[in-house]
Amino acid sequence: MATEYGDDDGGLYFHSTQMQSIHESLQQEENQRLYLQTSIKKLESFKHVNNDSSNNSNSGAVSVVQIKKKAATKKRKLMARKPNVKKPKSSSEAVRQAFEKDKFAYFTNNQAKIDDFLPGKSTSTEPSTSNQGSLISSDEWNYIKQIYLQKPTKNKTTLKSIRKRIKQYENSGTGMWEIAALNVDVSLNDEDIQHLYALDEEQMVSDDNSSTEDDTDPTQNDGLILTLSQNCSTQRDICHHEKDDQKYILIDSSICETYQQDKSLQRHSQKDSDNGNTIPDQNSAITIGEMESTAAHEVEEIFSTPSYVPSNKLNADQDRSDESESSIIMLADNIVSTQPDIVESISDSESEIEIIERPRLQVLRSVYENGTSTNQTRQELTMPKCLENNKISENEEYESEVVESDSTPIITPVVTPTKKPHIFPTNEPAIPIALRSTPNKIKNNVDRIFGSPSPIKLVLESPLKKHINIEFSDSESIYSTAVSQFGTPKQTTSFSPEVLTQKVGSPPLDACSDSGPTGVVSSMPYKKPHSTKRLRTTTLEISAALRVKNYTDPKNNITVKKFGEEIKREFIDLDNEIPDSESSDDDTGFSIIEITRQVEECKEPANDDYSEEQSTDLFQIGLKNKQETGNTSHMQVPSSPELQFENAGNTFLNSSLVEEDEFTKLKATELRERFKDWGLKPVQRKDKMLEILQGISDFISPESLLALKGFDLQQCVFDKLELLIKQDQFWYDRILTFEPIRLEELKQWLNSHNHHLELDILRLYCDRNCITTTNT
């Protein structure tokens, strides 16, 4: 039984293990199949599927539901809304908007409206061409002209009113103008004139006192200028009539004045002649031949600008104007044109040079077309007689000088009319050399300068320039482009010292003599020599136990500087010796100082090596012999707790101790007032205030703390802090790179240099100088 039971237990175990292994394999296959299905589904999104295959595939509809966000509710404002009411439009604005709309919409797709509009537009342009036939003929105008000039000036109507009447008669039908133009030989009687000009009986009886009212300008009485012309379309219409029927009239203000003063003139007197019709006033009568060109039957201009007449020929031309038959009538007597005379531009062909001495004036002028006559008249105007008389004598005294001028023609678009004043001689002395180039001095010697369009060159000559002979040596070049004004080594004549000292601020010229060689005088001012200061610097090596501070004595010109931090000496233990425990750390360190002082100048030759008696250094320490010291300037000074000097003026090293007793004498209230005056934050206890003041006095020594008032104390502290930071490259680089600085680290760094300042002072310094700080 036992064997069977044992066999049975072994068979069950075997079968159970087989079943377990089969189950695990099936479960693994199932997991693998599920993994493949999920991976295939993920990769189906990247598969390229056709439209046919996509339709056959049973893909489920995917619905995307958007999550609704809760709308943020705005807080309502308790304000009354403004009613959106537009401004009422006026009727004119409504009509304007209606007419400003697109007008072409009326004609779109409607040919009938276009056809109706175009004929009316074409007929509106016809009257412009039809007006040409309504012009007055020459016969009608001649008849109107005769009647117009026979009437007195006060009773005349202007051309504007006549044209207005003509238009009225044309609109009404046939009027008096057509009736009057039928027969030219028939003259109008009083009744015709009364009907023609619409005059009443009073105006017909009293010619002098009556006046007609028409729309004329208020400046009519100043003078009437009338231009009689016809706007003919072609030249053929101008030559249509004969020469005897054409008349041209010029009326001036002078004619109107004489015509008003003549009371004996008859209104209806008229004379006709075959050669030409004339006007009763003889002063205003102009014949046809005077206003017409004899070469061709063409109308010339009536009004033209009169030509310029020179002043010397004005009287002769006025006499000849009366004798000539076809001359133009002058507007008034003694009228001279303001236009400049016609002058040719300067050219290379013909030019005349005039030389006038004292002052010398060189004038280049062009020649008139008439030759010598115009040149003689211009010479009479420009050159006075006194200059002509003295011309020979001055040529002998002064040497002549001719300056070549540029022959380029000068073209000016507009030449202003100027008068030509005379140049009067002056009795002033010659201008010195130093003042020749100043324009103000030239104006004083030359009163007036010619106003002619030709260019003027002014050349002034001084008597200092005469009889100067310059000899050149072999080394000097005879073709030099410049010669000194103040003399050369081989110059025979020397200038007076007055001329030289006017322009050059140099030393006296007594040293320069004619016998010895003289050099060119410099134009720079003479500089006085200044004495320079001689400073001597001594470098000393001092033990760390000796406390030395920077000091400056401006009175005695002494400066003491301390370089860098204290340097520790390296202890070399060769035999593994244990250092003495009694020796202090102060004995192992040292510092370097530099003393600068001023050395008095000595007439004896300078000696770089000086003895102990000549030295004025602060540290009266005997120097070694020259053989022992050599070129070294460093000395080892034994350490001592504190230096004590015999001189009272050199107590700057312990200046804080002097003020400590003065601080202790002050009361707490007085110390608080001092703190407020200095801009410091006051504290409660007196001991704390004394500690702060002691640290500040040690920091800014040798300045006296009690002598500072206001913000001077802060400025002294800030200046000393800035100097210390610039000497330390680490802190200086951090500040320049705007790196945030912890005030605790800055305070510890100052404490390592035996400077004790509070955090409030450091924070105020950083805020004042824009230095970034941090508390972390």
UniProtKB/Swiss-Prot annotation:
One Gene Ontology MF term: 5'-flap endonuclease activity
Cited InterPro entries: Slx4_ascomycetes, Structure-sp_endonuc_su_Slx4
UniProt-annotated location(s): Nucleus
Region (Disordered): 201-223, 263-283, 507-531
Record PTM text: Phosphorylated in response to DNA damage.
One Gene Ontology biological process: DNA repair
Sorted UniProt keywords: DNA damage, DNA recombination, DNA repair, Nucleus, Phosphoprotein
Tree of life domain: Eukaryota
Chain intervals with Acidic residues compositional bias: 201-217
Pfam families in alphabetical order: Slx4
GO cellular component: Slx1-Slx4 complex
Coiled-coil region(s): none
Job description of the protein: Regulatory subunit of the SLX1-SLX4 structure-specific endonuclease that resolves DNA secondary structures generated during DNA repair and recombination. Has endonuclease activity towards branched DNA substrates, introducing single-strand cuts in duplex DNA close to junctions with ss-DNA.
Summary of subunit composition and partner proteins: Forms a heterodimer with SLX1.
Family stated for the protein in its record: Belongs to the SLX4 family.
HAMAP family according to UniProt: Endonuc_su_Slx4
UniProt name for this protein: Structure-specific endonuclease subunit SLX4
Species annotation: Candida albicans (strain SC5314 / ATCC MYA-2876)
Encoding gene (name): SLX4
